């Protein structure tokens, strides 16, 4: 297996998604907060989007089954939540750090993986977005909340913007790791601005 820059960035994305899911479980008032349920929420948040992407692409076995390092990244993320719950919860609430970094990383990597499987650009952008958001959809559903992508804040749209930028820079033969960083950074910046300024897409009206 090639342990490239993007590979380690992907593991970092897995870890921050685990932290996002586990801290969401800890913060939820109606959640039981036992060790297994907190771990499972973090686990399903981390692997949900990538699993759906791999199934769609026919990439079997799915990534977390064939690469044990993904499971280790999940374990490390869960361990951080258990050992430093107040610290990671503060970061998550004040900086939107883990969700924001997670979707930035996973959108771009999902887009790249789809392209590597010979998928057209439009489908690659959608699969990149799905890679980033589907774990969060499952997390919010488990928490009995409206999934984040259906709320006012700009979320999935930021992922699509990052995917499109990645595709454009890839077409211009931008260096792969630089493309990853720039495209993921665009997603992070859009999310932070949207949250800071309370921006959202306009509602559709039914006449």
Give residue ranges: language-model regions.
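Helix-coil boundary and interhelical linker segments in multi-pass alpha-helical membrane proteins
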Residues: 1-6, 55-65, 110-123, 168-179
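Structural signature of hydrophobic alpha-helical transmembrane segments
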Residues: 4-15, 62-76, 120-132
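The first (N-terminal) embedded transmembrane alpha-helix
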Residues: 7-21, 40-44, 162
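C-terminal ends of transmembrane helices
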Residues: 19-30, 54-55, 79-92, 137-147, ...
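Cytoplasmic-side transmembrane-helix entry/capping segments in multi-pass membrane proteins
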Residues: 35-41, 67-71, 92-103, 127, ...
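Small-residue-rich segments of transmembrane alpha-helices in multi-pass membrane proteins
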Residues: 39-48, 98-112, 154-167, 188
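Short, structured motif recognition centered on aromatic/hydrophobic residues
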Residues: 40-44, 51-57, 126, 130, ...
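Membrane-proximal helix-loop-helix units in multi-pass membrane proteins
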Residues: 89-148
